[in-house]
Design a protein with these regions (language model features):
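Conserved catalytic-core motifs of GNAT/GCN5-like acyltransferases
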Residues: 68-73
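Glycine-centered, phosphate/nucleic-acid-interacting loop/turn motifs that mediate DNA/RNA or nucleotide
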Residues: 64
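N-terminal helix-turn-helix DNA-binding core of bacterial DNA-binding proteins
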Residues: 9-52
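Basic, amphipathic "hinge/linker" alpha-helix immediately C-terminal to the N-terminal HTH DNA-binding motif
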Residues: 74-96
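Basic amphipathic alpha-helical segments that dock to polyanions
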Residues: 53-60
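C-terminal regulatory/oligomerization modules of transcriptional regulators
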Residues: 1-8, 67, 97-129
Length: 129
């Protein structure tokens, strides 16, 4: 079971930048807001830990794909809000194209390698009654 979980996390790791940019494409958001929206939109299937999310946001900012701005919240707290840049929109378009190509290729591979029953093997079919 642990091996399956690790594989699932490997797939997710490759989509973190894409998902964060998708969530930021329409408005500024802060880190906790991003993680909550991501979990909610994915029905809890895509959780992003702070230890993964913040370094990714930092890297996207360093690469010019995001801008960050500190805003005061309440008396003593500040939040860092992230906003996608024009370079970020270009990068997002590139990531979406890559994702579409890869998932399309994987779908084709899955279709071609689907298990086909051997002769004499029982295959359940739906009855048309």
């Amino acid at each position: 079971m642990a091996k399956q979980i690790r594989n699932k996390n490997n797939i997710k790791h490759g989509t973190i930048e894409l998902v964060l940019l998708l969530l930021l494409q329409n408005e500024q958001k802060y880190g906790y807001q991003l993680s909550q929206e991501l979990e909610e939109m994915s029905d809890g299937k895509y959780e992003l830990k702070e230890t993964t999310m913040y370094p990714t946001l930092y890297r996207l900012t360093q690469n010019g794909y995001l801008d960050s701005e500190q805003k005061k919240v309440g008396v003593r707290r500040t939040r860092v809000y992230y906003e996608i840049t024009s370079e970020g929109y270009k990068y997002l378009t590139h990531l979406k194209q890559e994702y579409t190509l890869i998932t399309g290729a994987i779908d084709k591979i899955m279709e071609h390698t689907a298990h086909k029953p051997d002769e004499g093997e029982y295959v359940e079919t739906k009855s048309h009654t």
